[in-house]
């Protein structure tokens, strides 16, 4: 097995995840079995309880792990499901070391960072690769070289090269070369210091990748090679591009794939990058455009909805369209009248309400769902967005005045959304939700079944992350009022009826909402069916509007 470790220097948020995923895509395009591991030096066990404003979205894997958003990048770029155990945190490592100490596994030993913590880190990396059946394992070390939190991990990967041999381990270091407009020059000193810091802990990079605004000129590449003792053909420029899906193509053009094959003693192969070329062409030169309004809670931090944004991009590729996102702060909709709603949501070709937690902005999201329902605007609800759609329908169509979710009002007269029975005895917050892949039985003859390619009905799987569900006590009343329950998970313990997985409104141009998070399974070459159908409906709505305008003009 071969191992590629990716570290970062100078500043955080340089894009190590995208760089690692892009390299993985180049290796996958050459036919290698690749998997990815993300190391996060924080003491949290996982990302599940962290603030979206600070950490971005929590990406949920098929196995139910709540992980760093970079795992989502790996799944999208590599077009595979990353197995459990591929997001390693300091909290996980120390928890296991302490468990072993208490169990007596280290009897007579003084438990220390070296070798016990570093051995546990190495064990987890190897297990992740073996579990995936990989030939090449990409390991991104989070944080910045020089941070105190990263030191045990850097020591572990230093040992890795000693353990596995030079031909099986490669170190890639990502740094920043800022451009100073006042002096009209690139500054390489931060990169020089970053590599020196990495060398001070015993790691010499085999490849240096440089983030910069534009592609580095040859003289700057030569200077970096000279001062970092890395050959010039191993210094790569990761410059700003229009879309992240251009990064693999830009790196391949510079020869990254060939250099990695040479360093790891692999036979050179020709990559098949046609799917990436076609995807980028569609992104940059679409035949149509569509605007989607996202009524959310974390609109100031788009990374909180990263997979959702990428899913819309994938849906755009499938429909040969550019998807423009209009961010709408749901709190601002709360007090909005008709004029305010029209300003925020008017001219949007579709409205999407994403997942989330907490009461802030809830009434604004309900108004967004009502706006879409009553005006025939395509609507897609994700997780909380489905619960919002049910609350709105219960209040304004089913006649259940005061309907709400128990999450927001435990004294509501009609708790149409309630805590799942199996959650009643749950005390802790971390890792205790309904997580990962769950089956959805789709009803034949519904929009959702058509989208998933099972028009007569069938079972599909999507990822979930929730504690609350549509209250089974109200499903009959909601259906009598015209709401279609198009998908359920049957046989859930503690209830007579199945858990509601999707709802829709018959006769509406497109009103579909799911309890699941289909964005987590969307890929550039395999878009999520609900997202692809949503964008298609939004484009269809544009055509209808244009035809209506033409008819009106003709009649005048």
From Swiss-Prot:
Role: Catalyzes the ATP-dependent amination of UTP to CTP with either L-glutamine or ammonia as the source of nitrogen. Regulates intracellular CTP levels through interactions with the four ribonucleotide triphosphates.
Record text on subunit structure and interactions: Homotetramer.
Reactions catalysed, as given in the entry: UTP + L-glutamine + ATP + H2O = CTP + L-glutamate + ADP + phosphate + 2 H(+); L-glutamine + H2O = L-glutamate + NH4(+); UTP + NH4(+) + ATP = CTP + ADP + phosphate + 2 H(+)
Residues reported to bind L-glutamine: 53, 356, 384-387, 407, 467
Similarity remark: Belongs to the CTP synthase family.
EC numbers for this chain: 6.3.4.2
One GO biological process term: 'de novo' CTP biosynthetic process
Residues noted as binding CTP in the record, renumbered to the chain: 12, 147-149, 187-192, 223
Gene3D superfamilies given in the database record: 3.40.50.880, P-loop containing nucleotide triphosphate hydrolases (3.40.50.300)
Residues the record marks as active site: 383 (nucleophile), 517, 519
Additional record remark: CTPSs have evolved a hybrid strategy for distinguishing between UTP and CTP. The overlapping regions of the product feedback inhibitory and substrate sites recognize a common feature in both compounds, the triphosphate moiety. To differentiate isosteric substrate and product pyrimidine rings, an additional pocket far from the expected kinase/ligase catalytic site, specifically recognizes the cytosine and ribose portions of the product inhibitor.
Pathway note: Pyrimidine metabolism; CTP biosynthesis via de novo pathway; CTP from UDP: step 2/2
Protein name per its UniProtKB record: CTP synthase
One Pfam family, short name: GATase
Ranges where the record places region Amidoligase domain: 1-266
Organism for this UniProt entry: Deinococcus deserti (strain DSM 17065 / CIP 109153 / LMG 22923 / VCD115)
Domain of life: Bacteria
UniProt keyword annotations, A-Z: ATP-binding, Glutamine amidotransferase, Ligase, Magnesium, Metal-binding, Nucleotide-binding, Pyrimidine biosynthesis
Residues that hold Mg(2+) according to the record: 70, 140
Residues binding UTP: 12, 187-192, 223
Single GO MF descriptor: glutaminase activity
Regulation: Allosterically activated by GTP, when glutamine is the substrate; GTP has no effect on the reaction when ammonia is the substrate. The allosteric effector GTP functions by stabilizing the protein conformation that binds the tetrahedral intermediate(s) formed during glutamine hydrolysis. Inhibited by the product CTP, via allosteric rather than competitive inhibition.
Sequence ranges assigned to domain Glutamine amidotransferase type-1 in this UniProt record: 291-544
Class of this enzyme: ligase
């Amino acid at each position: 097995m071969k191992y590629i470790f990716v570290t970062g220097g100078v500043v955080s948020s340089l894009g190590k995840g995208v760089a690692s995923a892009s390299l993985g895509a180049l290796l996958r395009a050459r036919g290698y079995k690749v998997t990815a591991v993300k190391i996060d030096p924080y003491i949290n066990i996982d990302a599940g309880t962290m603030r979206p404003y600070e950490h971005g979205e929590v990406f949920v894997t098929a196995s139910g792990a709540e992980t760093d958003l970079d795992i989502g990048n790996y799944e999208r770029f590599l077009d595979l499901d990353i197995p459990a155990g591929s997001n390693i945190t300091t909290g996980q490592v120390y928890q296991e070391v302490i468990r072993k100490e208490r169990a007596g596994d280290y009897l007579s030993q003084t438990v220390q960072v070296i070798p016990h913590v570093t051995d546990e880190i190495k064990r987890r990396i190897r297990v992740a690769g073996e579990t995936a059946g990989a030939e090449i394992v990409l390991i991104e070390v989070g944080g910045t070289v020089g941070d105190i939190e990263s030191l045990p991990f850097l020591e572990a990967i230093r040992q890795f090269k000693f353990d596995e041999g030079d031909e099986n381990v490669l170190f890639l270091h990502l740094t920043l070369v800022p451009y100073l407009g006042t002096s009209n020059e690139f500054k390489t000193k931060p990169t020089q210091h970053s590599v020196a810091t990495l060398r001070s802990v015993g790691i010499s990079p085999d490849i240096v990748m440089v983030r910069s605004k534009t592609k580095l000129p040859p003289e700057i590449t030569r200077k970096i090679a000279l001062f970092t003792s890395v050959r010039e053909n191993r210094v790569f420029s990761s410059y700003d591009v229009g879309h992240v899906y251009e990064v693999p193509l830009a790196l391949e053009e510079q020869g990254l794939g060939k250099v990695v094959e040479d360093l790891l003693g692999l036979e050179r192969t020709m990559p098949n990058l046609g799917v990436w070329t076609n995807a980028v062409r569609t992104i940059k030169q679409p035949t149509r455009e569509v605007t989607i309004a996202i009524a959310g809670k974390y609109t100031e931090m788009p990374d909180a909805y990263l997979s959702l944004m990428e899913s819309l991009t994938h849906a755009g590729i499938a429909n040969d369209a550019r998807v423009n996102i209009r961010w709408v702060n749901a709190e601002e909709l709360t007090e909005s009248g008709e004029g305010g709603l029209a300003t925020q949501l008017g001219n949007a070709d579709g409205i999407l309400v994403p997942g989330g937690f907490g009461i802030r902005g809830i009434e604004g999201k309900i108004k967004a769902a009502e706006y879409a329902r009553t005006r025939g605007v395509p609507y897609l609800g994700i997780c909380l967005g489905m619960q919002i759609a049910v609350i709105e329908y219960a209040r304004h169509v089913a006649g259940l005045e005061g309907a709400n979710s128990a999450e927001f009002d435990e004294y509501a007269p009609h708790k149409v959304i309630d805590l799942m029975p199996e959650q009643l005895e749950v005390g802790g917050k971390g890792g205790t939700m309904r997580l990962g892949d769950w089956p959805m039985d789709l009803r034949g003859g519904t929009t959702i079944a058509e989208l998933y390619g099972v028009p007569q009905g069938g079972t599909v799987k999507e990822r979930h992350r929730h504690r609350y569900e549509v209250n089974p006590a109200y499903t009959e009343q909601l259906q009598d009022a015209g709401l279609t329950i198009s998908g359920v998970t049957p046989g859930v313990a503690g209830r007579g009826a199945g858990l509601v997985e999707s709802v829709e409104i018959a006769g509406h141009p497109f009103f579909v909402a799911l309890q699941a998070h289909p964005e987590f399974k969307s890929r550039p070459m395999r878009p999520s069916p609900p997202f692809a159908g949503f964008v298609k409906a939004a484009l269809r709505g544009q055509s209808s509007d244009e035809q209506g305008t033409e008819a009106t003009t003709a009649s005048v």
